[in-house]
Amino acid sequence: PWGTCHAVLAAKDLIDGPFAVINADDYYGPEAFRVMYDYLSTHEDGSYYDYCMVSYLLRNTVSENGSVARGVCVTEPDGTLHSVTERTRIETYENGVHFTEDGGASWTDLPGDTPVSMNLWGFGKSFLDEAEQRFAGWLTENLPKNPLKCEYFLPLVVTELIEEGKAKIQVLRSTDKWYGVTYREDKPLVVEAIARKTAEGQYPENLWA
């Protein structure tokens, strides 16, 4: 598919109600799914599209083995999303977490409790219609520029809907630690964490039994 939004559109004919979107190769923890379910099962579109996302504390998503890219969230006073800014080089250091936008010439600190997006979104079926309507225009503009690597990202459509006043995205919070394998060295830590949660009874030995 041409990016995350196009991947969601591929399932359009199979979706008939509110739905969540995740990265298939990430571990989000149980809290995120609880708050997502609670929101989607009690909210629906009214005068605006009523969507949500689950944010994580930055310190619970970084790697000790190198830099990561994260979507840094800014929220409105009512807890809805104002913007997501992609910071492509975030690193830990002895005093905390910081990012650079100029190849390391200068660094800016980020508080560990900064909310970041890990691509856990909750939408109503209306999102599919909006994304589909915008896809042809996006393809016409971007395919000639970068035919092999252009991507139709979910946050692109979300940002457009917010700017047009069509949607509000409630920013939900999870304090669980997020796990993903950004670097080869991350894998043993993830394997150990999942094994520990299984031993504690949080997950069964055989998920598919």
What feature does the model see in each segment?
Residues P30-M118:
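Conserved core of the sugar-phosphate nucleotidyltransferase
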Residues C5, G29-P30, V181:
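Loop/helix-junction capping segments adjacent to catalytic residues or to phosphate/diphosphate-binding pockets
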Residues G17-P18, D50, A167:
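Short coil/turn segments at beta-strand junctions that form active-site/ligand-binding loops
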Residues V21, M53-V54, V171:
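Structural beta-sheet core signal
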Residues T75-P77, V84-A209:
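Conserved alpha/beta core of the MobA/IspD/sugar-nucleotide pyrophosphorylase nucleotidyltransferase superfamily
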Residues P1-G17:
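Short phosphate-binding loop-to-helix
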Residues Y28-G29, F123:
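Hydrophobic/aromatic residue at the end of a short beta strand that borders the catalytic acidic motif
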Residues G17-Y27:
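Short beta-strand-to-loop acidic/aromatic patch adjacent to the donor-nucleotide binding site
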